[in-house]
Amino acid sequence: MKNITILGSTGSIGVSTLEVVSAHPDRFRVVALTAGNNLEMLRQQIETFRPQMVSVLSEKLAVELDRSLPGYKPEIHYGVEGLIAAATAGDAHMVVAAIVGAAGLVPTAAAIRAGKDVALANKETLVTAGRLIMDLVRDKNVRLYPVDSEHSAVFQSMEGQSRKDVLRIILTASGGPFLNLPLDQLSRVSIDDALNHPNWSMGRKITIDSATMMNKGLEVIEARWLFDTPAERIDVNIHPQSIIHSMVEYVDGSVMAQLGVPDMKAPIAYALTYPERVPTGVNPLDLTALSGLTFFKPDYRRFPALKLAYDALAAGESMPAVMNAANEVAVEAFLSGVIGFIDIAATIARIMDAHEAHTLSTIEEALITDRWAREKARELVGLVRR
């Protein structure tokens, strides 16, 4: 029986994780859950999984949750302290880090410090403080299992192989909803257009990141740290069918790939049960039903955010933190109708231009850098034309 904590249990990854847990009650016990402000869903999860501890966004929500629970009541925490309490809960063997954005950095680091293995769905943690987090992983001798479908595919394609034999990593990307839209129409796309992903069902923020391909840029940076591979050996291929989730090319010319229908339950289950595999309910892949698998290079004119991610990696380790923070603010501004779609990348570029990259010595320095970039981006979005 593996005891798990889920940070972000009411989000897309959290819900899928609990579906995997429900399918295998003999394997998993839920110790702690954290959520933002979706109390209705959290109440249902508490009733079903009876965690020892939960945490919500604020004290007000914690009081409201406590009053609304008719039966079983776990310990109720709130805020950053609540996230840390859940992440370090003594009974947990593994923490699923599924909080969206840089907000996941502090509790994920706390889980690692507490000696917990981590199933990492929060790519922003490694984008914001990659070297520091990986140093912590090695120091505490814990395992970091990738949950992102692309990184899970790379992880699986490297199993049993020597890292010195890896020539390059090839991350695949669907291209999102605007892959074939004429470039001159990108400035006019609506929020609903951007949220209409062709292949994956995800949260709002990551869906916008997929439309700009910033999501793939974040994944390039995450792969750099997860697999200790320099950016020049991490390529991105557009693969509209989303069947091959990523590939690894070796020095002998062999290419290992992981295939499957687009469903996050598969990589989640592998992270939870590694090195075993369990049934997930994911539909089987019928290759004969596919008309073909296509691949091509991304166009930086269409996806400038992807180029910004490579630029951030090249600039130095504080720059990805700045890029990520600016992106989070810009996406929030777009989803609020404050700026247009093409203004997202333009906002990020402006904030990156205003930052002089430097080495990050501590998690706190990474957080300070993150806060600086957010403040600058918030100032800027009020000046960007809609």
UniProtKB/Swiss-Prot annotation:
Catalytic reaction list: 2-C-methyl-D-erythritol 4-phosphate + NADP(+) = 1-deoxy-D-xylulose 5-phosphate + NADPH + H(+)
Residues that coordinate or bind 1-deoxy-D-xylulose 5-phosphate: 123, 149-150, 174, 197, 210, 215-216, 219
Pathway field: Isoprenoid biosynthesis; isopentenyl diphosphate biosynthesis via DXP pathway; isopentenyl diphosphate from 1-deoxy-D-xylulose 5-phosphate: step 1/6
GO MF terms held by the record: 1-deoxy-D-xylulose-5-phosphate reductoisomerase activity; manganese ion binding; NADPH binding
Enzyme class: oxidoreductase
SUPFAM superfamilies (UniProt xref): 1-deoxy-D-xylulose-5-phosphate reductoisomerase, C-terminal domain, Glyceraldehyde-3-phosphate dehydrogenase-like, C-terminal domain, NAD(P)-binding Rossmann-fold domains
Keywords assigned by UniProt, alphabetized: Isoprene biosynthesis, Manganese, Metal-binding, NADP, Oxidoreductase
EC number(s) from the headed UniProt entry: 1.1.1.267
Binding site for NADPH: 10-13, 36, 38, 122, 124, 203
Family according to the record: Belongs to the DXR family.
Function: Catalyzes the NADPH-dependent rearrangement and reduction of 1-deoxy-D-xylulose-5-phosphate (DXP) to 2-C-methyl-D-erythritol 4-phosphate (MEP).
NCBIfam families (alphabetical): Dxr, PRK12464.1
Name used for this protein in its record: 1-deoxy-D-xylulose 5-phosphate reductoisomerase
Source organism of this protein record: Geobacter sulfurreducens (strain ATCC 51573 / DSM 12127 / PCA)
